[in-house]
């Protein structure tokens, strides 16, 4: 009973915080009642011009779907999403943000359970959708409610992984680098650029035709339905999936404390009695729910959803990138092609030691988990994740010898055609 009362009080406090954030956002800006044009008339210049004149003071309408394509990379931790994010970050007309929902999570739910209890999940998703809507409309001031300490004069040095966004390390946001500098290292950006001015960041966002956001904090595409159905956002979702066995292996190597019991199992061959199995089952359940929705082709996902396997991208990065860009209606720039050539061939010692690195031998990395996981862990994973493994075309192994035989691929040739 005592825990129940604590849960009720916590939910009430979080709800008040969200409402306060929303009210403060509305009251901080002038309110306009703007007539929304009929989408069928978007090609009629006079109507659109009149609409813009009436609403030019209101950024939500001033940066609508007639001008921008918005992209969301829907992924889970250690699935290759940082690599995919760079495919958009390198495009000169894309404003890219790396995990802005991190701030929502750390502010509202500092102790979010890996199993994502229903109450916490609803709170997190509601706030996340509100923030995404604002960011896609280049309202970066909305972030200030979640950044701690709160920015002063719209300036902060606490934006998570600011250096992972090329737009936030370039003019007009930062003048430390010239346009000819090419690839800007994340650490160099953080060291050489001054604190982030959100007003200049907003200006940079509005100058670009596309906004791309990467997140591992939205469990399923179903959770994005309200945003996808909003015609003003013109949102398209790239769902990135990876073999759950590879995800588990990467997490064991990267998050050593959190996955300590998995490491014990791998080393001793004995499964700890108190192992948190939700660290595996949550990934498979979320994948299955989301992919099942996407592949069932509901009307609200027509032209809005593309499923991409990390392994396909790793084995043929340029061809897969071309397919993704074609689906999104983006031109494949030379800078993106050059980045792919430079960052998917051969090992990179510096990046290999960094848990969030994107420079790697992508083809070799796709199935390297087979040399790191024990067969008993793999066998258990195949049992609890059988349905999603079958759905995505990942083959099971039946012996330690088969697991370590790298001459036999565990990835079926399977094509996932976008729903157009």
Swiss-Prot record:
Gene Ontology molecular-function annotations: keratan sulfotransferase activity; N-acetylglucosamine 6-O-sulfotransferase activity
Keywords for this protein: Carbohydrate metabolism, Glycoprotein, Golgi apparatus, Membrane, Signal-anchor, Transferase, Transmembrane, Transmembrane helix
Protein name, UniProt field: Carbohydrate sulfotransferase 1
Entry function: Sulfotransferase that utilizes 3'-phospho-5'-adenylyl sulfate (PAPS) as sulfonate donor to catalyze the transfer of sulfate to position 6 of galactose (Gal) residues of keratan.
InterPro entries to which the protein is assigned, alphabetical: Carbohydrate_sulfotransferase, Gal/GlcNAc/GalNAc_ST, P-loop_NTPase, Sulfotransferase_dom
GO cellular component: Golgi membrane
Glycosylation sites: 64, 153, 197, 342, 405
Keyword Membrane: yes
Recorded catalytic activity of this chain's protein: 3'-phosphoadenylyl sulfate + keratan = adenosine 3',5'-bisphosphate + keratan 6'-sulfate
Keyword Transmembrane helix: yes
Gene field: chst1
Superkingdom of origin: Eukaryota
Lumenal side: 24-420
Species of origin: Danio rerio
